[in-house]
Structures are given as structure tokens and as C-alpha cells.
Amino acid sequence: MRDFSGNHDWLSINTATVRKQSGAEVPLDRIIDQCAERGIRAISPWRDQVAAVGLDKVAKQLKAHGIGLSGYCRGGFFPAADAAGLKAALEDNRRAIDEAKTLDAPCLVLVVGALPGALESKAAYKDIARARSEVRDGIAASLEYAREVGMPLAIEPLHPMQAADRACINTLEHALDICDELDAGQSGMLGVALDIYHVWWDPKLQQQIARAGNAKHTRLLAYHVCDWLTPTRDLLSDRGMMGDGVVELKKIRGWVEDAGFAGFSEVEIFSNLDWWQRPGAETLDMCIERHCSAV
């Protein structure tokens, strides 16, 4: 396993981690500058943040600073109430693939979606099997275009408590089953984004990580870190800083690297009650410290 104790060369910042600083939204161009000031070599930006600044401007700023990407957030949300909605989702994913390519991302992360309308407490239907079928079909269609463009897709399984509203793929095993079905040739164009927050609890985690690495090209395309706090006060927005919770981060990173992953450890922390209320400099400096000591 790589030794992170001496530097933060393999630290990436998911820009959600510092999108709020001292309780206020901060634009992406400022976040990029803050990362550059600290020698952080990679980020994973969100589409809305990129759009607010401008895709071409962000691409130029990243190039000027010599900052790369560890992923691009996000595509997905494939299920819909009707044919028009399904078509619109596919068109939006095409745009996301194009944006990821412009930014030279190594992959587009897919948060696949679930019961359409559930995020607004107005689910169009309750049939989760239908949602999973629409997800499978949406990934298959998007993969065709992704192959043409040369942009790998990374399915991110989410915690089961988000199965109704955000993602109906909830285990690494399920995500890998879809990869094996749609990319039987193991081309490297379809894999997974492994987020500690969502999968740390899974009794099959070590086995499935090893399975992901047993492909011609490892299925592990992105690795997201944070920690699980006890108690967790908000399921979405109370992630912990690495080392503040109960996850065996170093053990899991060992499994991930044994499976062939040699990329960035991407810090993704949603923390409305804590880190988003602190100055961005404090949060980024702590990310560096904990990357070296806890990840």
C-alpha cells in the first residue's frame, strides 16, 4: 500500500467538500485557487459549479494551475415517469459526458437515480424494479456514446437509505453485476466509483473489491473518502472528516490498492452542521492533514 504519511500527492478534493465556506456558497474558481495554493493536484468538480463559472473558463484555469481531475460529478438519474423523461435523461448524460471530456476527467461518476420525483416527495411510481431496469437501460445507452467519446463511466452505489430518492444501486456487488453484463469484454469503459460513506458497512465489501480488481482493467475508477459519524445527524449532509468516525480507512484503502487502484483518494464531505460552517482554509488544511494521517 502506498505511504501517504509524507505528502499529499494523491489527495483530491471533491469540490462539494468546500462549496460552502463559513456558511456561504463559494464559486468554483475560488476553490480551484485555494487548492492550487496548497499544492493539491486534483479535484472532482460538480456540474452546477462548472456551469456557474463556465466550462471553458474552468478548463483553462485548471490547465494554468496544473490541476487534474479525479472524476466529474455527475451523470445518472436515469429513471423517469414517461418516455419523454427517459429521453431527456439520456440527453443530459450525453452533455455530462461531453463536459467531462472537455475537462479531461478520468471518468464521469454516475449517481443513477431511483424513484422519479421521490426527491420532491412526489414519487411517480413505487416499483423499484422498474427503476432499476430503467437505470440498466440508461447506462447501456450512455455507454455507447461514452465509448465513442472515450469517457469511462463510473457507477456509484449509494447507501440503502438513499435507494428511494437518489440511487437504486446500493451495493458494490450490484454495480459490478451491471458492469459485467454491459461490459463483458472488460474494456475499461465501465466501472465503479467507490465511496466509503456508502459502502463501508457492507459485509461483502472486501470480496467485491477484490472482484472489481479481477478484471482485465480494474473496475475501480474512483475512490471517495470521508468518515461515518456516530451518531449521524443528517443522512445526506453529516459526513465526517477522515479519522473522526468509525470507518477502517487504511484497511479499506489496502483492499482497494490490492485490487489495482492507484489513483487519488478523493475527499467528499457534505457537512452542513460542521465543515461547511468553517473557513475553507481550515477545511482544506485538515483534509491534507488527515490524508496523511488517517487515509
State what each model feature region is.
Residues 1-39, 104-105, 140, 169-194, ...:
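Histidine-acidic metal/acid-base catalytic patches
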Residues 3-6, 83-191, 201, 287:
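Active-site acidic/histidine proton-transfer and metal-coordination neighborhood
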Residues 11-27, 78-90, 125-131:
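Active-site mouth loops of central-metabolism enzymes
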Residues 12, 44, 71-73, 109, ...:
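Conserved beta-strand positions in the central sheet of alpha/beta enzyme cores
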Residues 17-19, 47-51, 75-78, 112-116, ...:
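Active-site-proximal loop/turn and secondary-structure-junction residues that shape catalytic pockets
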Residues 31-52, 73-76:
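N-terminal substrate-binding region of glycoside hydrolase catalytic domains
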Residues 42-63, 115-119, 162-163:
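Glycine-rich, proline-tolerant flexible connector loops at the mouths of alpha/beta enzymes
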Residues 77-82, 116-121, 161-165, 232-236, ...:
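A short acidic, helix-capping loop that chelates divalent metal ions and anchors anionic groups
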